[in-house]
């Protein structure tokens, strides 16, 4: 078992793993690759990879089989019936924490929903899901999307500030799956300094921004404030 698991783990993209056997018990340490919950495909989920390797190594366990069938290493929610996409992007699923308490195994999952899929529709998609397999889905929190159409005066004002300062007219305004404090107020847009072609290692070790990028962002923000005041 240990040798087969070692072989399976060696073929993965885990940053690090270690198997320790003591008193007849096998402990597994696995280190994945962190990523923002809205872009889980960029990272490597240590739990998902480990469960997949356990099954590949011949470990028989009801939960491992259940997890691999319904969640696994996929990030599209298809295994639990939540796969969805619209013109603005795909639904993403990111498993965060798995724990055992009082004989019950639970997974805390972060799902980022495309803007056209409403909260009530998500609730219907989750209702009674998995109960015929001794499982249950519970929505702990669900928020309304923050969205402004491309022709919105707010979007136009911010985009003009960006193009006037940077000269970049090739890259257009886009939506992201990240949650922001802009949701706390009405008529607010999250407007950040991330530029195409640079991996800022967001929510990972060594997250950074270039000094030149920060200086340019200040100029963009100055123009943005002037444009917003003119609306």
Task: Annotate each PLM feature.
Residues 24, 102-103:
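Intrinsic-disorder/low-complexity loop/linker signature
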Residues 1-48, 208-210, 216:
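Fold-level recognition of mixed alpha/beta catalytic cores in primary-metabolism enzymes, strongest
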Residues 1-16, 73-90, 120-130:
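Short amphipathic alpha-helix segments
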Residues 34, 38-102, 108, 112, ...:
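An extended, acidic, His-containing surface patch that forms the Zn2+-binding/catalytic region
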């Amino acid at each position: 078992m240990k040798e087969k698991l070692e072989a399976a783990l060696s073929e993965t993209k885990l940053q690090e793993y270690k198997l320790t056997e003591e008193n007849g018990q096998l402990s597994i340490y696995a280190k994945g690759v962190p990523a923002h919950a809205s872009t889980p495909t960029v990272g490597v989920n240590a739990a998902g990879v480990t469960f997949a390797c356990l099954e590949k190594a011949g470990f028989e366990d009801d939960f491992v089989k259940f997890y691999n069938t319904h969640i696994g290493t996929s990030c599209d929610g298809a295994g639990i019936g939540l796969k969805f996409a619209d013109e603005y992007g795909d639904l993403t699923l990111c498993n965060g924490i798995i724990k055992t308490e009082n004989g019950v195994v639970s997974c805390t999952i972060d799902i980022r929903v495309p803007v056209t899929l409403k909260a009530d529709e998500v609730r219907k998609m989750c209702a009674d899901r998995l109960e015929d397999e001794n499982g249950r889905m519970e929505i702990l929190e669900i928020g309304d999307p923050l969205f402004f159409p491309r022709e919105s005066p707010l979007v136009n004002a911010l985009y003009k500030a960006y193009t006037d300062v940077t000269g970049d007219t090739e890259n257009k305004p886009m939506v992201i799956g990240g949650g922001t404090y802009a949701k706390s107020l009405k008529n607010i847009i999250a407007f950040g300094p991330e530029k195409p072609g640079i991996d800022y290692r967001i929510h990972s070790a060594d997250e950074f921004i270039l000094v030149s990028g920060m200086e340019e962002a200040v100029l963009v923000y100055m123009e943005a404030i002037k444009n917003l005041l003119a609306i």
